[in-house]
Amino acid sequence: MQIFVKTLTGKTITLEVESSDTIDNVKAKIQDKEGIPPDQQRLIFAGKQLEDGRTLADYNIQKESTLHLVLRLRGGAKKRKKKTYTKPKKIKHKHKKVKLAVLQFYKVDDATGKVTRLRKECPNNDCGAGTFMANHFDRHYCGKCGLTYVYNQKA
């Protein structure tokens, strides 16, 4: 039977084949006529790429069917260069986890069992209850709202 192969340039070539011929045989016949090596050929029929081991009958290719020949593209994307950085990477801060850290804000009197606060609590309504102020050598400072109480300094 006779089939047609449409090449990349739009030229149509005719091949004399049997329905029992494999795709490999068809590619070899195309190589004889066009000089394109079989490993670079891709044959398309009815929108499907034809695999080398199968026969023309497997794909229901009948007489005067047209196959489309396209070339196989080799390779992939362009290799990218590795970036070089001028500054070393910044080391992230590690959170220091202190077990039972709340105990440093309170003191329990041994004799009476009374609990007293060691730190001053921020009076600002925005901060809410339980927000303690930091003790500095000359002031109390709230880290949440920025409220600062400075100690009286004697001249």
UniProtKB/Swiss-Prot annotation:
This is Ubiquitin-ribosomal protein eS31y fusion protein. There is a cross-link at residue 76 (Glycyl lysine isopeptide (Gly-Lys) (interchain with K-? in acceptor proteins)). Keywords: Cytoplasm, Isopeptide bond, Metal-binding, Nucleus, Ribonucleoprotein, Ribosomal protein, Ubl conjugation, Zinc, Zinc-finger. PANTHER family: UBIQUITIN. Pfam families: Ribosomal_S27, ubiquitin. InterPro entries: Ribosomal_eS31 (IPR002906), Ribosomal_eS31_euk-type_sf (IPR038582), Ribosomal_zn-bd (IPR011332), Ubiquitin-like_dom (IPR000626), Ubiquitin-like_domsf (IPR029071), Ubiquitin_CS (IPR019954), Ubiquitin_dom (IPR019956), Ubiquitin_ubiquitin-like (IPR050158). GO terms for biological process: modification-dependent protein catabolic process; protein ubiquitination; translation. A zinc finger (C4-type) spans 122-145. The lineage of its organism: Eukaryota, Viridiplantae, Streptophyta, Embryophyta, Tracheophyta. There is a cross-link at residues 48, 63 (Glycyl lysine isopeptide (Lys-Gly) (interchain with G-Cter in ubiquitin)). GO terms for molecular function: mRNA binding; protein tag activity; structural constituent of ribosome; ubiquitin protein ligase binding; zinc ion binding.
